[in-house]
Amino acid sequence: MAGVAGWWADREELYRDGGAVAARAISHGGAQGDLLASFGRDSEWGPNHACAARFLRAFGSGDMDAARREMTADCVFEATGPAPDGVRHEGADAAHSVWTQMFAETTNPLFSTEEQFVAGDRAVVRWSYSWTDDQGAPGHIRGVDVIRFRDGLICEKLSYVKG
């Protein structure tokens, strides 16, 4: 570790000025954390962070097959409606079916991640979902997903909408 850190210390400014590495991240301590932070990497990044990133990218592009690959087979999805509790869907295939239908039956659907936070086996995602209605007028909702991970995959996705 010391050898790599020493080599990097001599070259960091050159790489940073050239745009080859991101701005320094916050170090979470230790030699490895310090080195990763100097590269702009979060030493706390792990399988759950990666799963969330892949899932949100897939959902944002409407690729429900890719989204399903980021869920456990027994994943639970609680939809935002109908009020007051939404509908509970059990299993990745059931969630996939709901989402595929939603994207297929909506004109110009767009799911956008506004913010995400992953800590341990939990994540919170603030999002917006927009569409065009039958008269051509735009519409949107904003909401939050509370996510739980198991073995680096989503095992629970509870969705809530501002209303």
Predicted regions and their residues:
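A beta-strand edge to alpha-helix "cap/lid" segment located at domain peripheries
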Residues: 1-47, 96-163
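Conserved aromatic
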Residues: 7-8, 61, 89
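Residue-level detector of alpha-helix boundaries and kinks
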Residues: 37-40, 52, 80-84, 132
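Short acidic-aromatic low-complexity motifs
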Residues: 40-74
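Secondary-structure boundary/capping motif
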Residues: 49, 54-58, 72, 92, ...
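Hydrophobic alpha-helical core bundles mediating ligand binding, dimerization, or RNAP-core interactions
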Residues: 52, 59, 71, 95, ...
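A solvent-exposed, acidic/Ser-Thr-rich amphipathic alpha-helical stretch
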Residues: 66-120
